[in-house]
Amino acid sequence: MNNRGEFMLKRNILFSPPDISELEIKEVADALRSGWITTGPRTKELERKIAKFCEVDRAVCLNSQTACAEMALRILGIGEGDEVIVPSYTYTASASVVYHVGAKIVFVDVQKNSLEMDYEKMAEAITEKTKAIIPVDLAGIPCDYDKIFAIVESKKHLFKPNNEIQKAIGRIAICADAAHAFGASWKGRKVGSVADFTSFSFHAVKNLTTAEGGALTWRNIEGIDNEDIYHQLQLFSLHGQSKDALAKTQLGAWEYDIKGPWYKCNMTDILAGVGLAQLSRYEGMLARRKEIIEKYDNAFKALGVKTLNHYTDEYQSSGHLYLTRILNISLEQRQEIIVKMAEAGIACNVHYKPLPMMTAYINLGFDIKDYPNSYEQFVNEITLPLHTCLTDEDVDYIIENYTRIVKEYV
């Protein structure tokens, strides 16, 4: 029964289904009919449009945000003997890429009652071996990039560059994990144009999807040609092959060289077609997410749960996730609430179990006891559905049930 005394029929509300319209289906069908289904003209067009959207000169589309983040580290020449700072409260991809390139992961705890890194602890973690910091725009909310850049500027005297790009940057590189934050902005600048390198995710659950995929953008670096960066990323993504399949279609252009024994992480034109259709609808999708967030915010003000501030004068979120924290509940009570929501037909989630609690990172020597603020964020967090397939009636149903269930615990 809702607050108007009306009975609400049980609904089946998924946590984050993809928002696929006939536009996406047509783009995929057109790609299939074209005979060009691997990396080709649609991928190049998506790269151009993403660069324009993010207000940068170039972008590269690859098969995941993880690949994009790793290739950024490789472009910077980061590897064995180097250190990269990562927040302890994030998804594994933020940290695993550091492991992939052979560098040392340095976890920093989040601030108390916040999902952002503790910037004082971040500054303390910087050494002569630190080559990059990976801030995470969790839930689509930009980090405080002014503070991050101020800290790395203050530590320039410790910085020892490994390659020409690091030397040109002249300080620790900021490689933003903006997997959640495509479309967000920081002080009027699009995320994608703020950090030195920014990686986005287009996975099936993200605001804008290509089913699987991601994009990497970067700021202009004085003395470094953007075309050289783009070309190197293309080499990294396709076995080090000097020509992609599209270039080899030119008359007599069969021959190619292998410049390095590198990787295979390119995007295909089928997936890029989905992305092009999504991008054409994206401003409306962002606006709808904002509407839902505002409805949630208004409904939960009196409930006593903690929520994130997605929209301020300083930044605008992409509205990717709606995280809530129910203070003073136990892990067992949190699970009870999630189960009760599921019984009402509403799928919820938790973002995130801190990485020092995961087997892979325990095996690397990390202990959650060293990250108490991350643990405090985790134990009482529940993420509600937030996506553009939700109707107003769905949102009302979620609000009614969440309010009813949480009131049993607060």
Task: Identify the residue ranges that each predicted region occupies.
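PLP-dependent aminotransferase class I/II
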Residues: 44-48, 56-59, 132-136, 141-149, ...
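Conserved active-site segment immediately N-terminal to the catalytic lysine
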Residues: 162-209, 254-258, 306-307
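Active-site PLP attachment segment
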Residues: 180, 193-243, 269
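Phosphate-binding glycine-rich loop
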Residues: 36-83, 97-99, 107, 156-160
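Hydrophobic/aromatic ligand-binding patch that stacks against planar heteroaromatic rings
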Residues: 96-98, 190, 270
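Hydrophobic "lid"/C-terminal helical patch
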Residues: 28, 32, 72, 398, ...
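N-terminal "arm"/small-domain region of PLP-dependent enzymes with the aminotransferase-like
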Residues: 1-36, 41, 257-259, 385
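PLP-dependent aminotransferase-like
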Residues: 74, 78-178, 185
